[in-house]
């Protein structure tokens, strides 16, 4: 399993890790985070994911380190703006796009960033996000995704983009 996201509270990472541990597969996870939160803040966010929480507690002891390896897999963290990040091509099977809203953080939702994320995904890879904003969905299509609205948790709907064909540009 391979994922990429904005790390922030580590929720997406922990959910992906719990899933990988339950299925007995290794996780290779790359997260981009412009402003990492302090260890003390991260330690307060507890989730009902017993396997992942055990690993996460160990990771917090070395926080903020940029690379963690374990029997469960690997977590790499890039502490910079996603616009500056160099991402591996055709590497990821999934991307969690989880910055603040398009209004609050328009750069992270821009076409250049979406193109970068599309190029990092393998064909058929998925990009998932809580935003269902029309302008964002149009930019996602332009970046080479088939765009779908899906039922959301706590929201009316979310967006899933499926990487199709060869990435544009």
Map each language-model feature to its residues.
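Class I S-adenosyl-L-methionine
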Residues: 132-169
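SAM cofactor-binding core of SAM-dependent methyltransferases
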Residues: 1-61
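Conserved beta-strand signature within the Rossmann-like core of class I S-adenosyl-L-methionine
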Residues: 96, 123-131
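S-adenosyl-L-methionine
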Residues: 1-4, 41-89, 107-112, 130
């Amino acid at each position: 399993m391979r994922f990429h996201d904005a790390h922030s509270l580590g929720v997406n990472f922990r959910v992906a890790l719990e899933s990988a541990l339950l299925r007995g597969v290794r996780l290779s996870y790359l997260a981009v985070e412009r402003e990492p939160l302090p260890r003390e803040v991260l330690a307060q966010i507890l989730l009902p994911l017993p396997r992942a929480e055990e690993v996460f507690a160990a990771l917090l002891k070395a926080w903020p380190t940029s690379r963690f390896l374990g029997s469960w897999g690997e977590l790499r963290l890039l502490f910079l703006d996603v616009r500056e990040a160099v991402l591996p091509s055709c590497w990821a099977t999934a991307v969690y796009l989880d910055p603040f809203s398009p209004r609050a953080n328009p750069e992270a939702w821009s076409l250049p960033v979406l193109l970068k994320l599309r190029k990092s995904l393998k064909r058929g890879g998925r990009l998932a996000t809580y935003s269902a904003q029309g302008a964002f969905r149009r930019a996602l299509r332009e970046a080479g995704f088939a765009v779908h609205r899906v039922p959301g948790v706590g929201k009316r709907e979310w967006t899933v983009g499926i990487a199709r064909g060869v990435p544009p540009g």
